[in-house]
């Protein structure tokens, strides 16, 4: 904000945050250059580190399914609280089991408080499948995908997930044809921003 006030900010910033604010707050506060965006929740780990949480083990590590950062109950509470505060929500969820937990939490929170301005951003979603896509169609969900993953992850994703699961991992066209809004991001600092 100081750089913007001094006229030295050449870009627009839409900042996410991962802690609840202690003051009255809502998504969209700010100005043309610096605006508060969504409340971000991390649900599982990365595909590369085999931390993304899947319902079935990794193809190349049959003893591992990944891990959740929060319990399903904690995810439900975080999503419910953020939705009731009027915040947009962004959720890092890669594996199908993680996405399932998030979609279940959104279904409950949105049924409880169907705000007209609600927007739930699912980030990465490499483990999405047809059933999850159908459930998402009934919700104000959008997808935040990372085109850079096509050059960094696509070469080993099939070995990690197997052909069936990896067929949806980069199937962004399927999401567009299903009627979803997609945004692209760099996933910087994990990937270069250019």
PLM feature spans:
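Active-site gating/metal-coordination segments in enzymes
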Residues: 18-80, 123-125
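Hydrophobic faces of well-ordered beta-strands that scaffold small-molecule active sites
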Residues: 11-18, 37-43, 89-91, 120-123, ...
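Glycine-enriched alpha-helix->loop->beta-strand junction motifs that scaffold or abut catalytic
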Residues: 32-33, 109, 135-144, 178-181
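Histidine/acidic-residue-rich catalytic or RNA/ligand-binding cores of hydrolases
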Residues: 99-107, 134, 153-160, 188-194
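Short acidic/histidine-rich active-site segments
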Residues: 47-50, 87-97, 145-147, 175-194
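Active-site gating loops and adjacent loop-to-helix segments of metal-dependent hydrolytic enzymes
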Residues: 46-68, 109-117, 142-143, 147-165
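Active-site loop-helix segments enriched in His/Asp/Glu that coordinate
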Residues: 1-34, 71-72, 80, 93-115, ...
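C-terminal helical cap
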Residues: 119-120, 130, 152-153, 157-182, ...
């Amino acid at each position: 904000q100081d750089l913007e006030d001094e006229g030295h900010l050449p870009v627009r910033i839409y900042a996410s945050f991962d802690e609840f604010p202690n003051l009255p707050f809502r998504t969209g506060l700010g100005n043309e250059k610096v605006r508060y965006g969504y409340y971000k929740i991390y649900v599982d780990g990365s595909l590369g580190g085999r931390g993304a949480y899947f319902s079935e083990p990794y193809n190349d590590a049959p003893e591992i399914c990944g891990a959740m950062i929060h319990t399903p109950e904690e995810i439900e509470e975080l999503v419910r609280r953020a939705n009731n505060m009027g915040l947009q929500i962004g959720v890092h969820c890669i594996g199908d089991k993680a996405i399932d937990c998030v979609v279940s939490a959104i279904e409950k929170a949105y049924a409880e408080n169907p705000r007209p301005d609600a927007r739930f951003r699912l980030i990465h979603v490499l483990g999405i499948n047809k059933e999850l896509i159908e459930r998402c169609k009934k919700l104000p969900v959008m997808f935040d995908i990372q085109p850079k993953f096509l050059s960094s992850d696509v070469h080993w994703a099939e070995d990690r997930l197997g052909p069936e699961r990896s067929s949806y991992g980069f199937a962004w066209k399927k999401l567009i044809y299903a009627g979803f809004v997609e945004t692209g991001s760099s996933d910087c600092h994990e990937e270069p921003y250019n």
